């Protein structure tokens, strides 16, 4: 019985090593374009982003300012301070211009007949991820990492794929400075059709 357990463990380790060898992970760090504001056609592959700012991830659009007390002016009652009436307060988020929408765009290539997943370590917030003009996933939470399988949206003709990410921070959505933008890494994960999924514990095929 002991030898059977050892054999099973060895087989599982061998399978895991084999699957790991068939998985590649690339940081999508450079060659991003960014623009503040809500731009209707920015998700489309043919959109011209040449006039946008060139950025490297991680990127926080608000930390460059301008700093202004009106950026985080809030009319609120702080119940923890036993306040019953709302009053104007400022400085709670550092006066940074984090409120609003922003777009990020880049492109990536993938081999044919593979499963492709995008893993976002941090995107603040209300992230809508588009691949080749189609929405691949939505993730509202800015502090949690998330991933989405983008295989169904990839070009099948060998052309580069366009990745666009729309983010939005709404007014009075935070009591402290939350960050703004793709403030953590973005990973491109390529696997075979049979693979262990991201954060998975079992094989899928």
Where are these regions (language model features)?
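Surface-exposed acidic, glycine/proline-enriched linker/cap segments
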Residues: 84-92
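Bacterial Sec-dependent N-terminal signal peptides
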Residues: 1-24
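Accessory beta-strand-rich segments of carbohydrate-active enzymes
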Residues: 24-28, 37-38, 94-204
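Serine/threonine-rich low-complexity intrinsically disordered regions
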Residues: 1-4, 68, 85, 111, ...
